[in-house]
A protein has these predicted regions:
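Short, surface-exposed beta-strand/loop micro-motifs that present aromatic residues
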Residues: 175-182
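Short acidic low-complexity segments
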Residues: 28-38
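Cysteine-nucleophile active-site neighborhood
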Residues: 49-127
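Acyltransferase
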Residues: 189-212
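Short acidic/histidine-rich motifs immediately flanking catalytic phosphotransfer sites
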Residues: 37-47
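Structural signature of beta-strand start/N-cap positions in the alpha/beta core
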Residues: 27, 42, 77-79
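Pocket-forming structural segment of enzyme catalytic cores
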Residues: 92-172
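Extreme N-terminal starter segment of soluble prokaryotic enzymes
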Residues: 1-5
Length: 212
């Protein structure tokens, strides 16, 4: 059984993530700082809201340093969800003041850009169910059928990766949308697995059994 630290930095809704972890048969601990992370086998970084606000709260609580120690040094598996995935990037143009982009955690070589679908009838945010295309094999998608790769999205920005090898899955919404990224012991999903019914639970279960 995995012991999962779910990071609550003040603007994310952790209840549905906790419910999903427990539904998969694992122990979930919600933490606001370093407590709980040291004893955890896996870490989940959820997120909703604005990139700049989230990064400020993370830095104010010292969570950037906690993640560096736990993920980069100790090698604990990290799943970052929605805004959490975007926070893995180096920068984001969301609400950039005078063209100065917000700095992210820098765990993935990527930048976050606003969705600009070519079809003017497609509304922003991208909200609802969408299928993803698997670009490469990864344990997060182990034993998942191509016909069971529909997930629930709610976002206006998306990650643009410098290294295409970091992209595991991609969706289409008038443009290519990075849906899953992975590097070493880090995985990010732009969609919400905890809101994606059977496919989301299967993906979450894969993460909780993953020991990179």
């Amino acid at each position: 059984m995995a012991r999962v630290a779910i990071i609550d930095y003040g603007i994310n809704n952790v209840r549905s993530v906790r419910n999903a972890v427990e539904y998969c048969g694992h122990e979930a601990v919600v933490t606001h700082g370093n407590e709980g992370i040291a004893d955890a086998s896996h870490i989940i970084l959820p997120g909703v809201g604005a990139f700049g606000d989230a990064m400020k709260k993370i830095r104010d609580r010292g969570l950037d340093e906690v993640l560096a120690r736990s993920v980069c040094e100790a090698g604990k598996p990290l799943l970052a969800v929605c805004l959490g995935m975007q926070l893995l990037a180096k920068t984001s143009e969301e609400h950039a003041d005078g063209g100065v982009f917000f700095q992210g955690l820098g765990l993935i070589e990527a930048d976050v850009r606003r969705l600009r679908p070519k079809d003017p009838d497609l509304k922003i945010p991208h909200m609802g169910w969408n299928n993803i295309t698997k670009l490469r094999e990864h344990p997060i998608l182990a034993n998942m059928r191509e016909t069971n790769l529909a997930f629930y999205f709610v976002h206006s920005f998306a990650m643009s990766c410098e290294n295409e090898d970091d992209v595991v899955g991609r969706a289409t919404y008038g443009q290519d949308v990075t849906a899953i990224v992975a590097r070493d012991n880090i995985v990010g999903t732009q969609f919400h697995p905890e809101k994606s019914q059977d496919s989301g639970i299967e993906l979450m279960s894969n993460f909780l059994q993953w020991n990179p």
